[in-house]
């Protein structure tokens, strides 16, 4: 219904295409031009940083910002197709942006960081406390001088969706699948309540589905499930020293894991 308006801004806009659902941080609609803006708590220097890898003879995205690029690329993939289904007779143009802090700009407001303070509830949840005059101060800053601004990643997103970057051939990144096949397979697995296939490696040691030592025994642990299936043992019950416990900048943990040394 909101999309029938000529110009409108929508926060947390939801789009559904087949089995894929996304919530876009900010949708800016100007006629038939849709600006898709994903806000990230990350700083970026356009004078020094690049969205693409600086390695010679390779066409790949910068690994430091790759998760963010694939996040917004997936959102664009869903939004473009959802709009075609919802408005078959309309022709929308979708542009993708990452909203980040620009390290090349100097703040024009003293104490800008004090306008938004991170607080913690008694339950341990974090929230942002906004100063009463924050909006007045922030909106008074000219667009050309704002520290937080949108960076155009539209072309990079299109190339990601088209499978043009080298990392999509990496078995450890997307199991060697191109973007479209990967997201379709992941959506199918999710709808069928099926655990997606994966390759174990040092990335597992920071797994977000890893149970903490003090958690209940009844809680599921995705990290242990994968290692039981792929390596044949439970890391929590293993008494021998594990690769994950080794410290050192130059220890090639993935090399050992590929050699079945865990």
Where are these regions (language model features)?
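Mg2+/Mn2+-dependent nuclease catalytic core
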Residues: 6, 11-159
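Cys/His-rich finger/ribbon microdomains and the adjacent scaffold used
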Residues: 113-262
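Low-complexity, intrinsically disordered regions enriched in charged/polar residues
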Residues: 4-5, 9, 173, 177
